[in-house]
């Protein structure tokens, strides 16, 4: 999957629901970053470790009951070392309990269109119905890396340390960081049921790709297959960029405004995929809302910029007002009428 567009470049059995193991933690990380972004928690907040969180088996940082760590330390431990105890501690901190956090995970999955996803815990340990498809994993991975690209601060870190009872070393579980020059993350997973899983991300020439491997029979195979998928994407596709955010497109007439017109600017950048070697070029058409009347707030939608390749519409972005335009007062309106009358 290409991250900026969400377009799937290659897939096989992508809708089959399977145990995801610790790749589950992509959703856990996404909800942590959401909570920080929304102001619910801060990176410096202290988290008291519960007995339940400390009891997690599998990959862990050996947290003790009643130990206190910051949100930042626990998040780093999840992203780098795939720590189950840290994941459950953060789930309890955000949700109040792991079960309540799992409800948030499933709600988020539904809102993202993850059609087969069913979470039963925050860390990915095997249960009967904890299942995701490769497409589900690609969708949540895309949301994490495009909405919070700063996560790569941790997902690209090979080794780090934290301090609790003693200094504890963190080593990244993602060997792709050593094997693939353009790797940016993201998350490994392995259990008896899930076998070996991977959500791999890599960025080259401004294009970021996501490769998902599930149920590989050995740990090295998941990395080799992910590299093959990433190489395929980078070798065969390129991104075409539209106009830049804030670029001025046209002057829009404003009825009864202090100013006669306002600049319509691009609200967001548009990108689309094309085959490498193709001569595909983007063309545009402007569609403006008729009869825009003052007052107009800065950022008001004034129309749309429509992108085409040939005769095929590829997408649309909003055109918004660059500045605010207040309603004209009676004196201004009188001056305009006088000008029109005597010109």
Annotated model-derived regions:
Residues 1-149:
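Active-site-adjacent loops and short helices of periplasmic peptidoglycan-processing enzymes
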Residues 114-115, 126-131, 135-343:
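Domain-terminus/edge residues, biased toward the C-terminal soluble/receptor-binding domains
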């Amino acid at each position: 999957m290409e991250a900026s567009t969400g377009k799937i470049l290659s897939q096989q059995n992508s809708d089959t629901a399977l145990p995801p193991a610790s790749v589950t933690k992509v959703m856990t990380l996404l909800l942590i970053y959401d909570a920080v972004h929304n102001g619910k928690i801060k990176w410096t907040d202290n988290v008291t470790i519960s007995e339940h969180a400390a009891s997690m088996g599998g990959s862990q940082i050996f947290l003790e009951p009643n130990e206190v760590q910051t949100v930042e330390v626990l998040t780093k431990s999840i992203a780098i070392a795939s720590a189950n105890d840290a994941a459950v501690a953060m789930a309890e901190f955000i949700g109040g309990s792991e079960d309540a956090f799992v409800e948030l995970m499933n709600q988020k999955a539904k809102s993202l269109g993850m059609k087969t996803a069913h979470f039963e815990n925050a860390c990915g340990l095997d249960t009967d119905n904890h299942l995701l498809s490769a497409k589900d994993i690609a969708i949540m991975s895309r949301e994490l890396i495009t909405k919070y690209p700063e996560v790569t601060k941790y997902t690209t870190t090979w080794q780090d340390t934290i301090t609790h009872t003693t200094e504890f070393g963190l080593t990244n579980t993602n060997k792709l960081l050593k094997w693939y020059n353009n790797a940016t993350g993201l998350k490994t997973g392995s259990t008896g049921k899930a076998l070996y899983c991977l959500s791999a991300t890599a960025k080259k020439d401004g294009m970021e790709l996501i490769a998902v491997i599930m149920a590989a029979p050995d740990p090295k195979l998941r990395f080799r297959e992910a590299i093959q998928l990433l190489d395929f994407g980078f070798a065969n596709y390129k991104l075409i960029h539209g106009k830049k955010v804030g670029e001025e497109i046209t002057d829009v007439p404003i009825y009864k405004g202090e100013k006669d017109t306002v600049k319509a600017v691009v609200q967001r950048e548009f990108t689309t995929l094309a085959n490498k070697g193709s001569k595909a070029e983007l063309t545009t058409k402007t569609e403006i809302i008729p009869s825009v009347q003052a007052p107009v707030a800065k950022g008001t939608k004034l129309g749309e910029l429509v992108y085409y390749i040939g005769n095929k519409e590829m997408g649309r972005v909003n055109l918004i007002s660059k500045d605010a335009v207040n309603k004209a007062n009676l004196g201004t309106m009188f001056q305009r009428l006088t000008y029109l009358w005597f010109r």
